[in-house]
């Protein structure tokens, strides 16, 4: 497996990407690179389109004859309904969501390729700044209060579980569109409470707020995902976050 970081390869340098592809000749591509911070996408839509759409187009073209898995997002939905399955029509509320839908369309045009829509993922990243759990700890270390929505609902999942599921799906080689998320629908505030149960020092630094108080671009209220389709393929059940935390007290999170 070859995992390329940004210093190793600028994905917007398409000649360099093509050269690297020719050198490595991969048999499978997992495309999880993106500009994924929604506020950053709102501020720099051209950059978001470059990274999220044009890069995907380049990689999907290079991988036309091999399995290709794009990591997409539950945020492609408007959040009015919740419990979205793969047949539910997307309705983006943000630049980020618009770019992910466009990337999905590129990938799904090839019947060999797969789109995985994920929810929040947490865990231990190399730099300690990627997962929602790490964002909370960084805010605490900086002395900031971390505001968590009581009326925004997601289906969070530990990244280690997502990784296991992705490898199983890649091995099965059944292309298509799949939702892959935890089995527990939780508000951001509930998620924060669960994380603070492991890191008690966070409690004074988390504050419940409503989406109505958010000044930025509209946020979908309930993007919980129905994952029945992918569960039928996997060899293990997708856990809820509270279940996983209780069962894995020593796993980093």
Regions found by a protein language model. Give the residues of each.
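NAD(P)H-binding glycine-rich loop region in Rossmannoid oxidoreductase-like domains
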Residues: 11-51
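Glycine-rich Rossmann NAD(P)(H)-binding loop
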Residues: 148-153, 178-186, 233
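Mid/C-terminal beta-alpha module of Rossmann-like enzyme folds, strongest
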Residues: 163-165, 172-217, 221-222, 253
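Conserved Rossmann-fold NAD(P)-dependent oxidoreductase catalytic core, especially the SDR/UDP-sugar
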Residues: 57-91
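NAD(P)-cofactor binding segment of oxidoreductase domains
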Residues: 43-69, 104-106
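Active-site helix of classical SDR
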Residues: 99
